A protein has these predicted regions:
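Primarily secretory-pathway and cell-envelope proteins
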Residues: 1-59, 108, 112-168
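Mid-length scaffold segments of soluble, non-membrane domains
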Residues: 59-111
Length: 168
């Protein structure tokens, strides 16, 4: 049986590039014919327990990794029952054991740790569900739902969602 010299291989293994740990992604979706998008960082689970550990309960979370998560709509929307005028915003979440909230914030262009509550436009409740299998990469989706859409965010064994529709 061939053998491997672990001590000799270790420096090369340790020096290999890891790549981007939390790659950026943009997801687009249609809301009554209008293109909305979310630009966000996608952290990996890497075997960790996420909510309540990596992302603590009852603390505003950047909803992704690195730079703040941005959301753009060219039309006025209703997000979870709250009015969101056309524009670009940042999205934050407040996870708790008793329920989650989505925060739409007016400040843009900042790092994900630079949250200012005084710039909040709205806070809305999110629907929370437990998934049967863990999701490795934090994932945002905008899925068709009638004339509107559902904004869904999934990571580990948790999925949160909120309806979005064009304001009439």
């Amino acid at each position: 049986m061939p053998s491997v010299d672990i001590a000799a291989a270790a420096p090369d293994f340790a020096a290999r590039p890891l790549g981007t740990l939390s790659p950026r992604d943009t997801v687009r979706g249609a809301v009554d014919g209008s293109d909305v998008w979310v630009h966000y960082g996608r952290p990996s689970r890497r075997g960790r327990e996420i909510f309540g550990r990596v992302v603590p309960w009852d603390v505003v979370w950047r909803t992704g990794a690195n730079a703040a998560t941005h959301f753009h709509t060219p039309v006025d929307l209703v997000v979870g029952g709250a009015d969101v005028p056309a524009g670009t915003y940042t999205l934050w979440t407040l996870p708790s054991r008793g329920g989650w909230q989505l925060i739409v914030n007016r400040q843009t262009g900042q790092w994900g740790t630079d949250y200012h509550a005084d710039r909040d436009l709205v806070r809305v409740d999110l629907q929370v569900e437990t998934l049967p299998a863990p999701v490795e990469l934090f994932t945002v989706a905008i899925e068709p739902d009638g004339a509107g859409a559902m904004l869904r965010m999934s990571w580990d064994r948790t999925r949160v969602s909120v309806p979005i529709a064009r304001k009439r």
